[in-house]
Amino acid sequence: MTAEGQMHGGAVHGIGNALFEWMGFDKDAQPMTTNFADYLLPAAPELPPIGVHLLAYPSTKNPLGVKGIGESGTVPAAAAIISGIEDALRDYDVRIDEIPISPARLCQLIQAAKPPDC
């Protein structure tokens, strides 16, 4: 159960990185997102069901056989989300080069892209 919770938490963190968690600064380098009203985090309504499938391969590097697992949910989530968006918009040749990708930024990229040949 602990490993499943770590995977869920890591995936939610990756989703937040890709879509929500923007840390902005003004022209004087002061943070613009200083509270959770401005710095958005994903909550249960924004999340898809997350399935976890675990395979047990104990470590031989320590006496308990334990390994870290939480990061394995975080690292691929943002890449998978951004790749999925780019794939959905492949006819427009949209390339996303920064995260998080906001709806407004995504609209800008689509509007600036070449229209698909019809």
Task: Go through each PLM region and give its residues.
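C-terminal catalytic domains of large/alpha subunits in multi-subunit enzymes
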Residues: 1-118
